[in-house]
């Protein structure tokens, strides 16, 4: 929005905006490949002024540099301050710190030029499998392509895929799966069979052939079994992945429980994932808590259009404060329709191009008898694909 005037705008508010100007100036510099030291200095300044989102950004920078111990220091500060993205990353990293410490050790040797061939293979493989960074992994492993080292070939295939060379990438996935049943190649092939052909049985056979207990494979087996309507097996594999603190598997398991009408189990697993920093789990948990509140007093729920669950509202407030626009929109439903908070929350969500927020602002201004603004927001909502309904369609025509 600010384009080339962004720096000028943010500079006006340095030290005057509780770290907001510093935070967004740092983001702007990141997008334009600015000086890393300057970016870190701005984010450090933002944290000192109370902007807790900056902790996550600093942690993310150190993660990309493979400095995980340093990253965890900042992510912990963000977690302790209540920042949910920092919490998620901190908990995710915590499960992998043994691998990450080894990466730090080997990366130091690489930078010093003292790393052995086997250690270089180990480092590249860890960066690929535990950090999910095929670009960095390829830089480390490319010398081993000539010996058909599977992680090196896989990293190359991912880069080809990113360059829209799908056919070449799939040929490599087939090669390394045939070569040694490499689990990442198996996942690539299985996911294509599922998405493209709905061939769940063959996809499952490929995954079984890996004999892998990696959470990626366990969770995807659960997904396949769910699509095959074998819900007991789906639960078994989702649970195996969830037991390893895989948050995606927890969310899938929660969804499975919801479809099976096992709401108590869904609530528990969503709560576990939410406490580990999952925004989507928190959002789903809030829905369940609100539904349970309605069941306690259905007559009141029908009479009062404002949502009632205090627990759900508290969760949505936290998610909204973390910048989640869907939570902002849902949180607005906990206020009477003429309350100023309805306008404030939906404006924040609209700034993130949330189409429901555009519609809600149209309704808000309609109730305020502000024809110009209500029509403006209904028009924007409609232009962005939101169905505003026959009544407001007719209202726009007048």
Regions found by a protein language model. Give the residues of each.
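Canonical tetratricopeptide repeat
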Residues: 24, 57, 89, 122, ...
